[in-house]
A protein has these predicted regions:
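Soluble catalytic regions of membrane-associated enzymes that act on cell-envelope
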Residues: 192-541, 549, 556-559
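Short beta-strand elements
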Residues: 750-763
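Aromatic sugar-binding surface patches on proteins
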Residues: 718-726
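A short beta-turn/strand-edge loop motif at beta-sheet boundaries
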Residues: 684-691
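Solvent-exposed serine/threonine-rich low-complexity stretches and specific carbohydrate-binding patches
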Residues: 706-717, 757-758
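Short, surface-exposed loop/turn segments at beta-strand-coil junctions that are enriched for proline
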Residues: 729-733
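Transmembrane and membrane-interface helices of multi-pass
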Residues: 2-204
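Phosphate/adenylate-binding glycine loop and adjacent helical scaffold
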Residues: 541-659
Length: 763
């Protein structure tokens, strides 16, 4: 016992050396956010204190062999190397977060060694600040360690040291890993305050000791196939298209990293996709569209198959992928020629294996490019080269009808491509076009390579469509463009922004363009396309399906009739959307137009969403174990014709919705120093509405509230409406701001209807 207490006292005597090293690293990290230091300092210190208290026993165990050594040189060598490694890990995790804009958790469990090497190569840019800081920090730590080890009469008495260690063991189980904090609309700052080593350790421990979910609930009464249900997807697209004698060609373009915060109308950071914006004005454009995955691993299964995730993503099951139906396999079986093109390796995320399982006729990755073509970076070929490669192939492979999938890669770290310097110069030109104030441009300068890659990909798309219009069959083609996820390297306001991507459906067959504010997800694309082709062209679809989606919602106003999971990384399944609420890492948020979220205390909705999410996780885990998704009989031959009487868009009970009160046709106008808003409020219910107050809220580009104004309390009869004018005096500097028109409760001010949000205006 005496030997143990001696080593324990020695540990606490030397511990200030490690704490000092960690503190210096934290100060270096916070120093790169000097303008926000006041908001960051206290939460960061609390998180670091939590990390120290909770993980103290683990540090002690790692140090114990060295602490027990009698030879001073050997003891110092063991402790010095061990603690240097801890500091190096913390520094590397900080550097990763600075480069990737995201925290590193248990992600690496979801990738092969070959994929990890490719990921690391993509993040090869050296963070010289952190590299230099780590060298200095380790030197300081070793210097203090040597001095502390010389102390012959340590200040720690054995009972105090034992008590401190015992309390830290208890703290590990009782205290939270990180402080819960309101990010104030700046998720990018919130993750700065997180202790990176504690987050990494917690995520990996949680992954390794995760409990098996509860018993799954069957969807059809067949416990072996709980995802199977009757195919009831309605044809929401059909009324919007002119039909032709032959089925249309389909081209799906998956743009790496394309997010709504920098693309499309009202983009929070300004739109850097002028061509896509122009195309959106000629298309069906979903403003509140969701990618169910936060990384590329899930986009092909989600978009092309409306498939569940399994443990690490559906395609990660490789040759053990359960038998399943998809857009590709169903169309392939009915005469479509199917093709897939990407500029990167087909091995990454098992993309090639997934497309092979669909029976895809042509699968082309980086290995299929002409060797004379210049590679963009470690990931593969730049988007212009990818589109040229596909166009050249298509010119020699005419087919009617065709399904073509093109997946880009340029908008991915390290964001390098031919002609990069020219596009960096164009970033400044774009800032001028967007009227971004001079004092707001630091962010854009710091991330010029990212914004340059966005402009480059937008130009590559412009080039592709200019050439595609010359191709045979263009007039009978439907083009679908979306992002695989929102790139994380640019600052995000909140967790949902990672999943917020545009959906553009463009076609010469389209009767007229529309902007759609209702929510849908990539899970809804395949069911909708198959319902459209079945209803309009007589193609057959399976009578039973395993789709997670129920079809694209065409409602012009904001609403969500869907419920679905979100998986940010291969090992992170913590988010779920049901109606107008999002359950994220155990916390509930309400979702508003523009995909803005606010914390919600709706306990009934929280209970329902938690139950739905738990049920999904249970059957998702069962899928991973059994490798069974649908019976063979469902896949043998598509047989279901379209019957509109059996179709419905909403198939799940929602945790919460915003009822029957709606705001529409809101318009903003600034006259002198006054903001004037006109809007229509309507009751779409079969009964009279409760009392409500029209509420106007003005925010800046970061979502910070700047003021509000109220109208008169009102009630509406069934199916009645009223025009409302709201006004507010403005005491704001010149710039771009946003107005939200909300159906609010007379007493609490909380939303009780479908508002209209994020309406831009210029002061």
């Amino acid at each position: 016992m005496k030997a143990f207490t001696t080593t324990l006292v020695r540990f606490f005597t030397c511990l200030p050396a490690l704490v000092l090293g960690m503190a210096i690293l934290r100060l270096v990290e916070l120093g790169t956010h000097a303008s926000d230091l006041k908001a960051l300092l206290i939460p960061a210190l609390i998180n670091d204190l939590l990390a120290l208290v909770r993980y103290l026993p683990f540090v002690f165990l790692l140090s114990l062999p060295g602490l027990a050594m009698r030879n001073r040189l050997a003891r110092l060598a063991w402790i010095g190397v061990t603690w240097s490694m801890l500091l190096a890990v913390q520094g590397a995790l900080i550097a990763y977060q600075r480069a990737a804009g995201a925290l590193l958790g248990a992600d690496l469990f979801g990738y092969s060694w070959k994929e990890i090497q490719l990921i690391l190569a993509g993040h090869a840019n050296t963070d010289f600040l952190m590299a230099a800081s780590m060298a200095i920090v380790i030197a300081v730590m070793l210097s203090v360690l040597v001095r502390k080890d010389r102390i012959e009469k340590p200040g720690w008495k054995p009972p105090y040291a034992i008590a401190a260690l015992a309390l830290s063991v208890v703290a590990f189980f009782l205290l939270p890993n990180q402080m819960e904090s309101d990010d104030g609309g700046r998720q990018d700052l919130a993750i700065v305050t997180v202790n990176k080593a504690a987050f990494f350790a917690h995520a990996n421990l949680e992954y390794l000791v995760r409990w098996a979910p509860s018993k799954p609930a069957a969807g059809t009464g067949d416990a072996a196939y709980p995802f199977v249900h009757a195919e009831t997807t309605p044809d929401t697209l059909g009324p919007l298209f002119n039909t032709q004698p032959t089925p249309p060609n389909l081209v799906l373009i998956i743009v790496e990293g394309l997010g709504r915060s920098f693309s499309g109308p009202g983009a929070r950071q300004g739109s850097f996709t002028p061509f896509l914006d122009e195309l959106a004005g000629q298309s069906l454009y979903w403003e509140n569209f969701v990618a169910p995955q936060g990384r590329t691993f899930g986009v092909l299964p989600s978009l092309l198959g409306s498939l569940p995730f399994g443990e690490h993503g559906f395609s990660s099951m490789g040759k053990n992928m359960p038998a399943h139906a998809s857009l590709v396999s169903i169309l392939h079986s009915q005469g479509y020629r199917t093709r897939y093109f990407t500029g990167t390796s087909l091995e990454f995320d098992n993309q090639g294996e997934f497309m092979k399982r669909q029976g895809t006729d042509v699968i082309s990755g980086s290995a299929q490019f002409d060797p004379s073509v210049q590679r963009g970076n470690e990931w593969g070929y730049a988007d212009r080269e990818l589109f040229d490669h596909q166009l050249k192939f298509a010119g020699n492979d005419s087919c009617q009808p065709c399904l073509t999938v093109i997946q880009t890669v340029t908008m991915h770290d390290p964001f390098t491509f031919p002609g990069q310097e020219e596009y960096k110069a164009r970033v400044t030109q774009r800032l001028d076009q967007l009227n971004i104030a001079a004092d707001k441009r630091a962010l854009y300068r710091d991330d010029a390579r990212i914004f340059a890659s966005i402009l480059y990909t937008d130009d590559a798309l412009r080039h592709y469509f200019a050439e595609a219009r010359k191709q045979p069959g263009h007039d009978n083609t439907i083009y679908i463009i979306t992002g695989d996820h929102r790139l994380p390297e640019l600052p995000m306001s909140h967790r949902l922004e990672r999943y917020h991507v545009p959906l553009i459906v463009y076609s010469p067959l389209l009767k007229e363009p529309q902007r759609i504010r209702s929510m849908s997800s990539q899970f809804d694309v395949t069911p909708s396309l198959l319902a459209f082709l079945s209803h309009q062209y007589g193609l057959k679809t399976p009578a039973q399906a395993s789709w997670l989606g129920s079809g694209l919602d065409m409602e012009p106003g904001f609403r969500n009739v869907h419920a679905f999971p979100l998986k940010q990384t291969k090992t992170d399944l913590h988010d779920y959307i049901s109606g107008n609420v999002m359950l994220s890492q155990g916390r509930l948020y309400s979702i508003a137009d523009g995909m803005e979220i606010d914390p919600s205390d709706n306990q009934d909705a929280r209970k329902k969403a938690s139950a739905q999410f738990s049920a999904f996780k249970a059957i998702n885990a069962a899928l991973e174990r059994s490798k069974k998704l649908v019976p063979a009989s469902v896949l043998e031959q598509p047989s279901l014709g379209y019957d509109g009487n059996q179709r419905k868009l909403q198939t799940a009970a929602l945790a919460a919705d915003l009822g029957n009160l709606w705001v529409s046709k809101a318009k903003a106008e600034v006259v002198e120093d006054e903001l004037r808003i006109s809007a229509q409020f309507a009751n779409r219910g079969d009964a009279g509405s409760p009392a409500f107050v029209p509420l106007l809220v003005v925010t800046d580009a970061n979502g910070r509230e700047l003021g509000e104004s109220y109208g008169k309390a009102t009630k509406l009869a069934s199916n009645a409406g009223v025009d409302v004018d709201l006004r507010m005096k403005l005491k704001l500097p010149a710039g771009t701001y946003f107005a939200s028109v909300i159906v609010s409760h007379p007493d609490t001010g909380k939303p009780i209807g479908q508002g209209q949000y994020h309406i831009p205006f210029t002061r």
